[in-house]
Regions:
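Active-site mouth of glycoside hydrolases
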Residues: 38-308, 315-341, 347-376, 380-455
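C-terminal motif of bacterial Sec signal peptides marking the signal peptidase cleavage site
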Residues: 18-20
């Protein structure tokens, strides 16, 4: 999700009711040939514009749960009981895919970054959070769920570009809340794709994560069937028109590196679409046509992008859906052209009055969710053979979507997140409860369940 700076009231915290889950696991070593063979057919692969899992077309409704590795840990911020309960609740409503962050990097205090950190200094990783990632991967497998794991962030709420640039002598990432701060942040982040030292540190991190052996399952990550895709970054951008060539080279080099370590799993960019490519659809096509990028991604944020007024987003819901539909169609045309699947891996709409917290009406959000889900659901067509009269299903390029995001039993306590607060899907610097879906958002959950039945079959 992107940087945003709205100040809004947060409602009081409600009590979480947690239930236990079994954390005992059996060690399985993928060093054994029979284990490797056993998991081989369970990887998510692609065939043209379709994903394939267990020998069948794989389409899904997923969600974003960036905080998974921290919540699934046993250290600061960890709550395995809640984590397992969230997975159970998501599975029950038909959500089968999670998009998660590998773990936060040390970030600028000006950004109110997510804590605790996985990467405290270049190459220095927090074993507790790594074990949380191990646990998350293992628990997803138990429930036949999959994960997209992103390895970096263009935004400094989890360190990201700012972590590497600070280590290269550029200082802390600029405070975007100050006058002119956003433009300074953009100029600052443009250095990432063209600074070889920063890139080399990032590549070293990729090697550490992707080549890891899971302490719970005993498998190397490359052999974990619950990992669907490694993702280069959350919302990577060139951050300047002059930076497009360096940006495209970075995307290609990072994807090739991951494939050299792990040829079993898909690789994706994490791009927002042309919005994240300086509105250059040709650049978007170029980076996704790369042989090591397996599918296309887009994000859709009507309120953040000005397709709905911040003061009254509900009044613009029809226009927001219209613009979103056009955005989807433009990128789906690219997906068909280069013969790869497309996923809307982030989308969201705020509550009534652009407020945040629980108990606030979600009528417009529900309409927006229904619109996005229907785009995925209608992407499957029943085709009748004119000669034989037999029918078969033909899939379009739009293969899945992940709403932003799941808070479940978590509840907001402060205006912005503070250590000790529940993790929600709203990043720490944003109003807590702004885009999150809580387990008490019954109308939204009913819509998710309804469309999941159609899309998942």
């Amino acid at each position: 999700m992107k940087k945003n700076h709205i100040k809004t009231a947060i409602l009081a915290m409600a009590t979480m009711i947690l239930t236990a889950c079994n954390t005992n696991t059996t060690s399985n070593s993928s060093d054994k040939p029979e284990e490797a063979k056993k998991t081989e057919n369970r990887f998510v692969t692609k065939n043209g514009t379709q994903f394939i899992k267990d020998g069948k077309s794989y389409r899904y409704i997923g969600t974003n749960l960036w905080y998974a590795s921290v919540l699934a840990s046993t250290g600061e911020g960890g709550d395995r009981e809640r984590f397992c309960k969230e997975l159970d609740n998501l599975k029950a409503i038909g959500v089968n895919n999670l998009r998660i962050l590998s773990g936060p990097d040390a970030g600028s205090d000006l950004a109110n970054p997510a804590k605790p950190y996985l990467q405290k200094a270049p190459g220095v990783l927090n074993d507790t959070i790594l074990e949380g990632l191990d646990f998350a991967i293992a628990e997803l497998e138990k429930r036949d769920m999959t994960a997209v794991i992103y390895l970096n962030n263009a935004w400094d709420w989890s360190g990201g570009f700012g972590f590497y640039l600070k280590e290269c002598g550029y200082g802390d990432s600029p405070n975007t809340n100050e006058d002119g701060g956003y433009n300074r942040y953009v100029d600052y982040c443009a250095n990432f794709a063209r600074d070889q030292k920063a890139l080399d540190m990032y590549y070293s991190y990729i090697k550490q994560i992707v080549s890891r052996k899971n302490s719970i399952t005993g498998r190397y990550y490359k052999d974990e069937p619950s990992i669907m895709s490694w993702q280069l970054c959350n919302e990577p951008r060139p951050f300047s028109k002059e930076n497009k060539e360096s940006f495209a080279k970075w995307i290609a080099d990072a994807a090739a590196l991951i494939k050299s370590i792990d040829s079993n799993h898909l690789v994706s960019t994490g791009s927002e679409g042309k919005f994240g490519c300086e509105w250059d659809i040709e650049l978007y096509e170029k980076i996704h046509a790369d042989k090591n990028i397996d599918y296309l991604t887009i994000h859709i944020w009507p309120v953040n992008w000005g397709w709905a007024k911040r003061t009254d987003p509900d009044s613009d819901i029809e226009y927001a859906c219209e613009e979103s539909g056009a955005y989807i169609q433009e990128h789906q045309a690219i997906a068909k052209k280069i013969n790869k699947p497309l996923v809307i891996e982030e989308f969201g709409f705020s509550r009534k009055g652009n407020a945040s917290g629980t108990g606030i009406p979600t009528e417009s959000r529900d309409k927006f969710y229904s619109f996005i889900f229907s785009c995925v659901e209608k992407n499957r067509h029943l085709i009748k053979d004119s000669k034989t009269g037999e029918t078969h299903t033909e899939e379009g390029a739009l293969a899945g979507c992940n709403f932003w995001g799941w808070a479940g039993s978590g509840r907001p306590r402060d205006l912005v997140w503070q250590p000790g607060d529940d993790y929600l899907c709203d990043p720490p610097h944003e109003p807590q409860g702004w885009y999150s879906v809580f387990d008490c958002d019954t109308t939204t959950i009913d819509i998710i369940k309804k469309y999941a039945k159609e899309i998942n079959r």
